[in-house]
């Protein structure tokens, strides 16, 4: 009982579903200090994900002197930079590996009912884009910004069998696993 409640509270604090149908997730907030003649100046950075849960997702990184302003800036930027991703009934079309900097992500499709098995920043991206079943692993750096960028790069590089068949000028039936 207590575990369920703590799980609900954790999810509620990190995710908001806004009236326009967008899912907004706060991935990380960081305090940065700059030492000047008069002492230290503190600023805050925020990393956020915005998605519609149906294959569209974007991320934003905002900086400001106050946390709410940094979050607001990053949300606005995330909405401006949204990209579309092709999904296969709530999972991926094929296994994907992508890098950004020293962060490397590996994602593969999972059978229905598996859920999102991913950590941290990857989980936020996958849930916002609308993936329901996936197995994912972060290798190398766990820097949230690089993990988000690598995850998005992998999702954008993923192609449906129909798209590949059109590019090659072949029939989709020729792409089955048995042939």
UniProtKB/Swiss-Prot annotation:
<dbReference type="Pfam" id="PF00333">
    <property type="entry name" value="Ribosomal_S5"/>
</dbReference>
<dbReference type="InterPro" id="IPR005324">
    <property type="entry name" value="Ribosomal_uS5_C"/>
</dbReference>
<comment type="function">
    <text>With S4 and S12 plays an important role in translational accuracy.</text>
</comment>
<keyword id="KW-0689">Ribosomal protein</keyword>
<comment type="function">
    <text>Located at the back of the 30S subunit body where it stabilizes the conformation of the head with respect to the body.</text>
</comment>
<keyword id="KW-0687">Ribonucleoprotein</keyword>
<protein>
    <recommendedName>
        <fullName>Small ribosomal subunit protein uS5</fullName>
    </recommendedName>
</protein>
<dbReference type="InterPro" id="IPR018192">
    <property type="entry name" value="Ribosomal_uS5_N_CS"/>
</dbReference>
<dbReference type="GO" id="GO:0015935">
    <property type="term" value="C:small ribosomal subunit"/>
</dbReference>
<dbReference type="InterPro" id="IPR005712">
    <property type="entry name" value="Ribosomal_uS5_bac-type"/>
</dbReference>
<feature type="domain" description="S5 DRBM">
    <location>
        <begin position="22"/>
        <end position="85"/>
    </location>
</feature>
<dbReference type="GO" id="GO:0003735">
    <property type="term" value="F:structural constituent of ribosome"/>
</dbReference>
<comment type="subunit">
    <text>Part of the 30S ribosomal subunit. Contacts proteins S4 and S8.</text>
</comment>
<comment type="similarity">
    <text>Belongs to the universal ribosomal protein uS5 family.</text>
</comment>
<dbReference type="InterPro" id="IPR020568">
    <property type="entry name" value="Ribosomal_Su5_D2-typ_SF"/>
</dbReference>
<keyword id="KW-0699">rRNA-binding</keyword>
<dbReference type="InterPro" id="IPR013810">
    <property type="entry name" value="Ribosomal_uS5_N"/>
</dbReference>
<dbReference type="InterPro" id="IPR000851">
    <property type="entry name" value="Ribosomal_uS5"/>
</dbReference>
<dbReference type="InterPro" id="IPR014721">
    <property type="entry name" value="Ribsml_uS5_D2-typ_fold_subgr"/>
</dbReference>
<keyword id="KW-0694">RNA-binding</keyword>
<dbReference type="GO" id="GO:0019843">
    <property type="term" value="F:rRNA binding"/>
</dbReference>
<dbReference type="Pfam" id="PF03719">
    <property type="entry name" value="Ribosomal_S5_C"/>
</dbReference>
<dbReference type="GO" id="GO:0006412">
    <property type="term" value="P:translation"/>
</dbReference>
């Amino acid at each position: 009982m207590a575990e369920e409640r703590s799980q609900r509270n954790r999810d509620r604090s990190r995710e908001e579903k806004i009236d326009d149908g967008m899912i907004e997730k706060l991935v990380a907030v960081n305090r940065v200090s700059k030492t000047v003649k008069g002492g230290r100046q503190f600023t805050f950075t925020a990393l956020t994900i915005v998605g519609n849960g149906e294959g569209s997702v974007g991320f934003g990184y905002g900086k400001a002197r106050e946390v709410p302003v940094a979050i607001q800036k990053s949300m606005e930027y995330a909405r401006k930079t949204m990209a579309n991703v092709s999904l296969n009934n709530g999972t991926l079309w094929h296994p994907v590996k992508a890098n950004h900097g020293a962060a490397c992500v590996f994602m593969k499709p999972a059978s229905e009912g598996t859920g999102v098995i991913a950590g941290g920043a990857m989980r936020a991206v996958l849930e916002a884009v609308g993936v329901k079943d996936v197995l994912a692993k972060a290798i190398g750096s766990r820097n949230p910004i690089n993990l988000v960028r690598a995850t998005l790069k992998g999702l954008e590089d993923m192609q449906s069998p129909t798209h590949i068949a059109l590019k090659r000028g072949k029939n989709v039936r020729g792409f089955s696993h048995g042939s």
